Every structure is written in C-alpha cells, then in structure tokens.
C-alpha cells in the first residue's frame, strides 16, 4: 500500500507593529470567520515573491497601505486536510511597521475584526501555537530595532 503525498501550498503573511507614544509597541491581530485570532496571510500569486505576497495580503486584509518591510521573520509549516486533500502548507512571515493606526478588516474575505495588542496580550489571544512562535520572534526583532537605534525607544529616557 502506497501513501499518497501531501499537496504543497505556499503562502506568506505579515506581522505588523506600530509605535505608541510612551508605551510598548502594538501588534496587529485579525479574527477570521471561525473566531480564530491570527495574522494576515494568503497564497502567492503567479510570479510573486513571498515578500510581495506578504505585503499585498497584509494590506488587503487590514486596509493598511503604508507598510514598511523590516525583514523576514521565519517560515512555518503544518499539515491539514481540506475537502479530502492532505495539504502540507508553508507560510513565510515578514515583519512590517505601520504608521497608520486604524485597520479596516476585509469582511468579504472573512476577516471579522482587526485589533492592536501589546505583545503579551497578543500572545494570550492567538488561536494557533505556531503563530505564537512567529510573534515571539517578531517581538525579538522589534527589541533589536530599538537596541540598535533603528526604531523608536519603548520609553523616553530623557
């Protein structure tokens, strides 16, 4: 008996953060139609790089148009079944900074809400364990931006 191989899918998504005066940065979460909290992501279109797909999907699903790419976070993968198919999905995540504060969920794609949360709040409400690992790494990257002077400090020091 031979095992059927999984169908491969590749997607890309974004972890968006913004600076808040005199407070820790906020991270953007989206809620899907199943009431799961996660991050914007979607399939790569023909000829699109993972970074291009991440910025497109993040902008589409959140309504944020002024996203600044800070760098790749990591690639995660998981297996699932959909309509009788066994799928092995890879998702490339990228870190984005946004100067905009009011996201607008893409309701026609099943996004029911967008919320800015602190790192700890976001870690508490995320619905998927593998998303927590991505967010923790994003938080480390933001702390590094602050440490090297490429980002705004979390608190004023003067």
Which sequence ranges carry the predicted segments?
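Acidic, metal-coordinating catalytic segment for phosphate/diphosphate chemistry
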Residues: 1-22
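Short connector loops at helix/strand junctions that flank enzyme active sites
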Residues: 9-12, 34, 88-91
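Charged phosphate-binding loop/patch that engages nucleotide di/tri-phosphates or the phosphate backbone
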Residues: 124-158
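A short gly/proline-enriched turn/hairpin at secondary-structure junctions
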Residues: 38-41
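Conserved beta-strand and immediately adjacent loop positions that scaffold enzyme active sites
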Residues: 13, 26, 113
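Unchanged
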Residues: 43-133
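Short, acidic/hydrophobic/Gly-rich beta-strand patch recurrent on exposed beta strands
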Residues: 28-31
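Short, solvent-exposed loop/turn segments that connect beta-strands within catalytic domains
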Residues: 20-26, 83-86
């Amino acid at each position: 008996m031979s095992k059927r191989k999984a169908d491969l899918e590749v997607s890309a998504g974004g972890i968006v953060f913004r600076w808040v005066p005199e407070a820790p940065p906020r991270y953007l979460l989206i809620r899907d139609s199943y009431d799961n909290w996660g991050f914007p992501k979607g399939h790569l279109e023909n000829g699109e790089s993972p970074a291009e797909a991440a910025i497109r999907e993040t902008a589409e699903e959140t309504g944020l148009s002024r996203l600044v790419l800070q760098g790749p976070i990591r690639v995660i993968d998981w297996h699932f079944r959909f309509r009788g198919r066994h799928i092995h999905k890879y998702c490339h995540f990228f870190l984005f900074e946004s100067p905009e504060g009011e996201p607008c969920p893409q309701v026609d794609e099943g996004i029911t809400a967008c919320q800015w949360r602190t790192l700890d709040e976001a870690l508490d409400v995320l619905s998927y364990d593998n998303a927590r690992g991505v967010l923790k790494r994003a938080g480390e990257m933001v702390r590094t931006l602050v440490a090297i002077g490429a980002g705004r400090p979390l608190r004023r020091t003067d």
